[in-house]
Amino acid sequence: MFIKIPGCVLLLSLWPLANQAQPVPAVAPATSPGKTKTAVSTPADLPATARPASPRQLFPGLFEAVQLGRVFPDNKTFVDAAPRQRPAAILAAWRREKARPGFQLRAFVERHFDLPADSAVAFRSNVAAGLRPHLDTLWTVLARPAAPAADPADSLAAFRSLLPLPRPYIVPGGRFREVYYWDSYFTMLGLIEANKVQLARDLTDNFAYLITRYGFVPNGNRSYYLTRSQPPFFAGMVQLLAQRQGNAELLRYRPALEREYRYWMQGAAQLKLGTAAHRAVRLPSGAVLNRYWDDSDQPREESYAEDVAAAKQSRQPPAQFYRHVRAAAASGWDFSSRWFGPAAAGSKSPDGGLPAIQTTDLVPVDLNCLLYQLELTLAEASRVADSPAQANAYAAKAQQRRAALLALSWDPKAGWFQDYNWRLKQRSSVRTLAGVFPLSYGLASPAQAARVAAGLKTSFLKPGGLVTTLRKTGQQWDAPNGWAPLQYLAIEGLNRYQQRPLADTVARRWLALNRRVFTQTGKLLEKYDVVNPNRPAGGGEYPLQDGFGWTNGVLLRLLNQYERQ
């Protein structure tokens, strides 16, 4: 399973959001990288009780009864429901009624909660109109309005899981009724192509608001997501706006970029060699890289029954298992064989599956490429702000990260960039499309990029595009599935290193697959089977979703790049 290898708080000033709907707490300024810092308490640093309460915290007992009793096929239904009364009143009614003959839990929930509506039910695709008109229509279908500050007279506002945002936003679609962090970068690609720059700015402003309010960007704008983030694409969003609007965007979002960097590096300065805390890992060399992490070690509220059942199949202590599962959710790759440890002795399986998940033990190559981009973006923003010392400090941190990541993740025998197990001091043998990120973000050498391109062509390239991994496990982030964001980043990386014929092949195969499925079904999907394009994609903890934000964004970007009309 593994191949052996030889052995700060930053400046924060609040920037104004025009017509901002919600107040933002003031935060003391802090020092530049490398200097002694003064601790500043933020919501991300405070105990969970200081954050908005989640459904499990609000409805103890009832929550477990509903989720473990599978009252709804999807556990996400209940956590997205809005209570019609205060929690104390609902809990009192449940305790009175639950022992009565004929009590029906679903009927009780439907009386006391407003269940989430499927907003896409009324939408019907017009296949005859074509793909581009469909994409234009979907921006409206998937758009959600800004939520103003809670009305003081609304006594139930604090008990809903949805976190208000000051700007309009785009949801992915299907069961995903809220904004998602890394999805939104790829959605923004399409918004900018569609000349909806203001909506792209709205998304970026919403994430800056979340960073200011909570100290980081949560997985999504739900109270039950406030224990973890997702792949940090905020710097990429700012760069998209800067490319379109100029360097003033770097200054506008600089405080939020610095605040997010602080979140990812929390505790790094105090780490001893070979240890980790939160999202930071200090290697034996002294270099610091990062991992995915969740502050909770309990079952995910939105997948509670699934997590409880899966923990019973694992030999790990439940808290450890749940932490790994949640960290995988933070990665966006939930779930994939890239996170799984070795199989038990005597097993014919190449890995131990979900019971052997070990996400927090791994230093992911893709995460550290994104943080490299964040450091370079901060260096650039500091130069624009005429702060050369800060610019040099961030640039140095980026180069230190690059050197450490390349040393640990590059497998010269496989010709691939792979995750690194910091506990075992071993590189993973699992090849995944995360290995294209060093090309996408310019960390790879030309020779390394050429070898990755060769590996993509011989192993990952399928009739519908690039397969996510080379293992077929039944997990949705494994073979035979392909995902829009990974296709796009692979294409970008190949073009960056002059591997244009392969980039063109990947793009055209992905476009053809998207078009074929749309013509047959009238839908654009969350993921696709790229091995057998005539078969729907599978895996995951929920049915295949349509919509779909990041698919739409990548599709429009590639249509304009390869089939501009």
Named regions from a protein language model:
Residues 6-16:
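Bacterial N-terminal signal peptides
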Residues 19-23:
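Boundary at the C-terminal end of the N-terminal hydrophobic targeting segment
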Residues 54-58, 62-178, 202-217, 221, ...:
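Extended glycan-interaction surfaces of carbohydrate-active proteins
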Residues 180-207, 434-445, 487-500:
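Alpha-helical support elements that line or immediately flank enzyme active sites
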Residues 189-193, 236-243, 373-384, 440, ...:
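Short glycine/serine- and small hydrophobic-enriched flexible loop segments
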Residues 196-207, 248-265, 374, 386-405, ...:
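Extended, well-ordered alpha-helical scaffold segments
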Residues 211-253, 545:
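Aromatic/His-enriched, Gly/Pro-containing loop or helix-boundary segments
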Residues 357-387, 394, 476-489, 493-501:
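Long, repeat-rich segments with strong aromatic
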